[in-house]
Amino acid sequence: MPELPEVETTVRGLARFLQGERITRTVTNRPDMRFPFPDGLGQALTGATVVSLGRRAKYGLIHTDRDQTMIFHLGMSGRWRIDPDETDKHDHLLIETADHRFALCDPRRFGWVDLVGTQALDQWPGFAAMGPEPLGDALTIEHLRAALSGRKQAIKLCLLDQAIVAGLGNIYVCEALWHARIHPRKAGGRVSKQALSLLITAIRDVLEQSIRDGGSSLRDYAQPDGELGYFATRFQVYGRDGQPCHRDDGGTIRRFAQGGRSTWYCPRCQR
């Protein structure tokens, strides 16, 4: 599933060609998406000018001059394609401008879009109870200490809770915990202040590096221009069970099931 860096990379790629442009045509092709396209989507977008693009957690945002925002989620396998040579049967949403064509391609159809008033964006149900952005100033030691106080739940699962930190997913939580040397099963309420400081730094470093690398291309994900992200070449633990820890401390990466997902860690250096 595309996570925060992949969505950020997607938004930046789209912005190069879509920001400031007038939408001349909108086509929706599939009625059987995870959620149906909102009524009136084509009418709302066609003729509108895109004033800016943004991201909140794992959601992409396309803001128009009609004070409306199209929210998109890439689901499990979604990606945007810019000026594709051919139409793909999985291109479920097409947006055209005078010079470019944008296709939202999603083979597994778990992605979706919504249309909301820009001024009411913070009240949209998916955002209303969401925690701070991991790359923003609101993610502080004080915030994490308050959010984790008394929590017996494993720190890995706490970090996946979007009400605690917005936008973190399995890949980058596993990687950040390794960098911070924190065991993923450790109770969130027992992580020390010093360790939380290291964790915040690790989260930001991992996410920022992945954005620079264009994200992690594992299965279906590619950048809008078709290029693959290469952060996967930097994985320290994710998907590396049975391989030696890169700290050369004699540890071997292990995997176990946690909260319905796989968790990877090094039992030697993560305590």
From Swiss-Prot:
The keyword DNA repair applies. Keywords: DNA damage, DNA repair, DNA-binding, Glycosidase, Hydrolase, Lyase, Metal-binding, Multifunctional enzyme, Zinc, Zinc-finger. It catalyses: Hydrolysis of DNA containing ring-opened 7-methylguanine residues, releasing 2,6-diamino-4-hydroxy-5-(N-methyl)formamidopyrimidine; 2'-deoxyribonucleotide-(2'-deoxyribose 5'-phosphate)-2'-deoxyribonucleotide-DNA = a 3'-end 2'-deoxyribonucleotide-(2,3-dehydro-2,3-deoxyribose 5'-phosphate)-DNA + a 5'-end 5'-phospho-2'-deoxyribonucleoside-DNA + H(+). DNA binds at residues 90, 108, 151. CDD domains: EcFpg-like_N. The active site is at 2 (schiff-base intermediate with dna), 3 (proton donor), 58 (proton donor), 261 (proton donor). One of its GO terms (molecular function) is zinc ion binding. InterPro entries: DNA_glyclase/AP_lyase_DNA-bd, Formamido-pyr_DNA_Glyclase, FPG_cat, MutM-like_N-ter, Ribosomal_uS13-like_H2TH, Znf_DNA_glyclase/AP_lyase, Znf_FPG/IleRS. A zinc finger (FPG-type) spans 236-271. Binds 1 zinc ion per subunit. It holds the Pfam family zf-FPG_IleRS. The keyword DNA-binding applies. GO terms for biological process: base-excision repair. Its EC number is 3.2.2.23, 4.2.99.18. Its cofactor is Zn(2+). Involved in base excision repair of DNA damaged by oxidation or by mutagenic agents. Acts as a DNA glycosylase that recognizes and removes damaged bases. Has a preference for oxidized purines, such as 7,8-dihydro-8-oxoguanine (8-oxoG). Has AP (apurinic/apyrimidinic) lyase activity and introduces nicks in the DNA strand. Cleaves the DNA backbone by beta-delta elimination to generate a single-strand break at the site of the removed base with both 3'- and 5'-phosphates. Monomer. Belongs to the FPG family. This is Formamidopyrimidine-DNA glycosylase. It comes from Erythrobacter litoralis (strain HTCC2594). The lineage of its organism: Bacteria, Pseudomonadati, Pseudomonadota, Alphaproteobacteria, Sphingomonadales.
